[in-house]
Amino acid sequence: MSEPECVGRASDKEVLHRFGYAQQLLRDMGGFSNFAISFSIISILTGAVTLYGVGLNAGGPVVMGAGWPLVTFFVLFVAAAMAELASAIPTSGALYHWASFLGGPAWGWLTAWLNLIGLVAAIAGIDYGCAQFLTPLLGLPETPANFTVVFGVLLLSHAVLNHIGIRTVARLNDLSAWYHAAGVAIVVLALAFFAPKQPVAYLFTKTFTTVTEKPYWFAFLGGLLQAQWTYTGYDASAHTIEETKNARVSAPWGIYLSVAISGFFGYLMLAFVTLAVKDLGATSAAANPFIYIFEQGLGSTFGRVVLWIVTLAMWFCGLSCVTSTSRMIFAFARDRGMPLSARWAHVSKRWRTPAAAVWLAAALSFFLPCLILGLVALFPRRLDFSRLYPAVTGISTIGLYLSYGIPLLLKLRAIRRGVWTERANGPWNLGNWSVPVNVVAVIWIAFITVLFVLPPNELTGSVFAGTLVVLLAFYFLCVRGRFRGPVRQAKSQEDLLMLEQELDK
């Protein structure tokens, strides 16, 4: 616990040195850019749109009117608890480092892999969803082969941009934040002025479900996946903390505000979209209920415009997610936590980016949908493709939130044992509210983890349980005793400065 307790008023680089790491990545992101990367990954124009049908079919308009604010309320507790830890332990390893310092290398290793699985599944879900939107817009037949090719091109564009530097990506993330706000404004204003509207009570009283074998309240809870998956990836502000100026303050605000502002804009958009529903049965049966609402209310031309707006938002979202995932891979490999760690921890001297980690993130993300398509082809009678996209998003949600929850639970244990004190906190902290906020956050994470593996999400549960068994077996058979958690890159500050000078040559 000594590392988190010694940061004081030191500069960003001095703090990083005290954790034993050199300033290898270019620290050029401002506070807004740090916020923008998490805001872009949350991307209300991605998660809320691609899973709109899931929420609508599960519980109807009430899922939008009551479900979204319910999830937002509890996710704000999670974000605040994570922000506090980011301020205390400001390294790119983020969740993995927090868990390691608080619980030891075993907890850190498990957290790292859960976070990596969640992030890779998130990239796959985002970019494959984007490919499904973009393919018909390009006039191509909507076949799995075409989806996969377009998906690969999207991933390639994200990898190239992340390879060539954080400055380019930061500017695009800044643009993405304003683009999302403008996109929501266009959607809301168009519906407010030109589309027919249901009464406001429709959002809170109109129930609907296609889950006939379960009681309505159970179906409603299942519909929360729409909002909960949208609120993933905001740990990106922590993963890019070594590239952020005034990191111990800017990154925590980036985590918290990305959730709060997304919650406001997301609710505004979902409310107006849902109030524009004409025929609930026809809308729920549509291939894309979100776009169907626009086509019915404003015509096919505007529906196509909205489709382009959403598709570009997904592209921005995928770009930011590759950035976050590559930083997580870099930090974990830097501590020798992955196979071929030396390769994945490589930093490009020219661009000062974790280039190898960028391409690994893209490759793993491309592999996942290809694996799913292969399974569908092999077992067409047992696997329904329509259930696989929610399964991927469910895996992403559970993996990420378990990786969020482990360090928060370990922190509560450390506080109870007297190991973590106020002295360990960074400048952004919750004071006396820290314990209750962390308790609520952990309870919520436990609740959604159980919820999203119950029927009709048993496919998610099966895949995730199998993955967890493999991870634990691999740890106890191959890793235990060898992996020691965060590793100092050098013994002295002079050696760290020499590492930094090597990159400047």
Briefly describe each language-model feature range.
Residues 54-64, 136-147, 166-177, 287-288, ...:
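Transmembrane helix-loop boundary segments of multi-pass membrane transporters
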Residues 22-26, 53-54, 84, 96, ...:
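Helix-loop junctions at the membrane interface of multi-pass solute transporters
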Residues 1-29, 408-437, 456-505:
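Terminal cytosolic tails of multi-pass membrane transporters
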Residues 97, 104, 135-140, 210, ...:
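TM-loop-TM module centered on a large, flexible mid-protein loop between adjacent transmembrane helices
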Residues 49-57, 66-67, 76-155, 159-163, ...:
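Hydrophobic transmembrane alpha-helices that form the core helical bundles
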Residues 64-65, 139-146, 175-304:
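Helix-loop-helix junctions that connect adjacent transmembrane segments
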Residues 146-198, 203-204, 232, 254-260, ...:
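Membrane-interface loop-to-helix entry segments
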Residues 31-50, 364-368, 444:
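The first (N-terminal) embedded transmembrane alpha-helix
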